[in-house]
């Protein structure tokens, strides 16, 4: 590798590349979430018959992974670059390897392996065939073909490529700590994020108000159900995301037992499944507007038969 790209140059390179492959460049969704997969740009759009190609950076919060800004690789919040393509291109793996080349990583000069790691997200009733992508022994990407999202079978199949930006940048810049990553010329990752990492870790593990969080979960769940009763999928999904983040805060604080944990996950999953079914029903009511006219007319005729 010649020039060591900054963190923001890595993002810009990936954005331009996937834009050239036909992806819309979306912006990070403005609600806390544990992974880019939970964005409505992936979760909702991966289901139903309409095509969808999108790429976006997603800050992902995992309260239990916080380490007060002291661990070089474990973070309360990390950044994912998410690519979602439906239907999945037959050459999606080749497209991915080409993206690495643009980042200065030549597949002929490095040990790049696709290690089978089938993916499942119990909170959203989602699963798929998956692989971890290992670069010289370090995982940098999760590669998934969705089989089920929100309890619904995906047809056509959606391909998801999730780059771990911190890990990728650490490798490209040859640094051992994420806090030493150069975000922009002259500005280190730690100068931006170390203090927030410390404060969020302290809040998650020591300060958070458990009683308030428990009450909030109940209120968010009730509001999500109320929205779904009125077929308001997107407001409902916002509250489902709030339920998920609130549960993660409770879990990090040790406020839920093993039995209670399973119960909370089931409650979130049930909401996600209803949201998924409602979303598909609403898209059908609208006539699947992203389908071409011939496919739309054929599909609607088959569903009415």
Curated annotation (Swiss-Prot):
This is Glycine--tRNA ligase alpha subunit. One of its GO terms (biological process) is glycyl-tRNA aminoacylation. GO terms for cellular component: cytosol. The keyword Transmembrane helix does not apply. It comes from Streptococcus mutans serotype c (strain ATCC 700610 / UA159). The keyword Protein biosynthesis applies. CDD domains: GlyRS_alpha_core. One of its GO terms (molecular function) is glycine-tRNA ligase activity. Tetramer of two alpha and two beta subunits. InterPro entries: aa-tRNA-synth_II/BPL/LPL, Gly-tRNA-synth_heterodimer, Gly-tRNA_ligase_asu. Its main location: cytoplasm. Belongs to the class-II aminoacyl-tRNA synthetase family. It is found in: Cytoplasm. Its EC number is 6.1.1.14. Transmembrane segments: none annotated. Pfam families: tRNA-synt_2e. It catalyses: tRNA(Gly) + glycine + ATP = glycyl-tRNA(Gly) + AMP + diphosphate. It is an enzyme of class 6 (ligase). Keywords: Aminoacyl-tRNA synthetase, ATP-binding, Cytoplasm, Ligase, Nucleotide-binding, Protein biosynthesis.
